[in-house]
Amino acid sequence: MDKIVIDGGVPLRGSVATSGAKNAALPIIAGALLAEGDHLVRNVPDLADVRTLGRLLVHMGCQAERNAGEKGALWIRVPAAVQPEAPYELVKTMRASVVVLGPLVARWGKARVSLPGGCAIGARPIDQHLKGLSALGAEIRLEHGYVEATAPRGRLRGATFTFDAQTVTGTENVMMAAALAEGETLLRNCAREPEIVDLAAALVRMGARISGAGADEIRIEGVETLRPLDHVVIADRIEAGTFLAAGALPGNDVTVQGCVLEHVEALVEKLRAAGAEVLPVDGGLRVVGDGRPRPVDVRTAPHPGFPTDMQAQMMALLCLADGSSKITETVFENRFMHVQELQRLGAEIAVDGKTAVVKGVPELSGAPVMASDLRASAALVLAGLAAQGTTEVHRVYHLDRGYERIEEKLAPLGARIRREKA
């Protein structure tokens, strides 16, 4: 098992490139199941979750391999028939595995998918996925830890469905299923994240008829067949946001290439409020951290609000603020597990339910810490970069689920960071 070792307190200078978005790539790769033939998905990050989904497709009878001629390209061949099952052994570590459910039942009329795993950050129910698919005519059974879905008529049928709560993967799952359903589907109270817009764009390139992605209502006119996919995945706004937060640490000056301002506006607003200078540059954003951050209050919300996936990284920055900040988590339960580890570095944080009060300190001090989930691990890396002395981040398999060799991206900026065997 690996650990990340950081000798902190060194200013960061330079430019870093953003990888493709994991949370866009995964549903787009799953969407390839909707059409027979050879698919090419470009700008796909080399991450554990992506590799797991590739193994799942191979288990089903597809071929999936990296295209040696193009960095970041994933070639997928989908046959006329597959084994429509996602077994627990393959998907136990990846919550996003549930996105194969919609494509499988839409194209082959049946699916058996293990209930998802992934980060342990509270309740992430898939009931909205199942209600949406039921509205399209699927019959759902939960048995022995699996979701079994069938289309009794052979094909799903269009319907109007309102999500009880906004759900990104739920919106994606039902939208993909509706693409091959008979008739029109109207989805209401949809999630609005950029990754949903990118998935819709990929499906439209396959011949789907989808409008409204990125808004509250999405309309899908079902078609009988789709064609193979060739699509470039958008940049990862959370990875970009993590590097923006690194640039906002005191004394740093970092340019994040490939970062789309419209995707990170809520974060940029808070970074500027904290005193960082954020400047649009050709192909990205430049962030300059000038002295200790100012305290700011942050409240997470679905897109276009402040992303829950940036809450931990923002907390790491505010640990050094000149004053007290309040962070309120409204999206997920149990998402302050990084607090105890930040406290080991000298942070002063008090948690009361869904709110954390961060009393800034002049400096942090390096120490061994342990990652509890994906974004918590990123927060610990940021804190370690700013801390005086050596920080060791353990259980970095969490980090590898969402960041493509983060140490290799930070080192050219001047960070004294390396990966070692724990």
Curated annotation (Swiss-Prot):
Reactions catalysed, as given in the entry: phosphoenolpyruvate + UDP-N-acetyl-alpha-D-glucosamine = UDP-N-acetyl-3-O-(1-carboxyvinyl)-alpha-D-glucosamine + phosphate
Listed name of the protein: UDP-N-acetylglucosamine 1-carboxyvinyltransferase
UniProt binding sites for UDP-N-acetyl-alpha-D-glucosamine: 95, 124-128, 309, 331
Function: Cell wall formation. Adds enolpyruvyl to UDP-N-acetylglucosamine.
CDD domains in the cross-refs: UdpNAET
CC per GO annotation: cytoplasm
Species classification: Bacteria, Pseudomonadati, Myxococcota, Myxococcia, Myxococcales
NCBIfam families, per the entry: murA, PRK09369.1
Pathway: Cell wall biogenesis; peptidoglycan biosynthesis
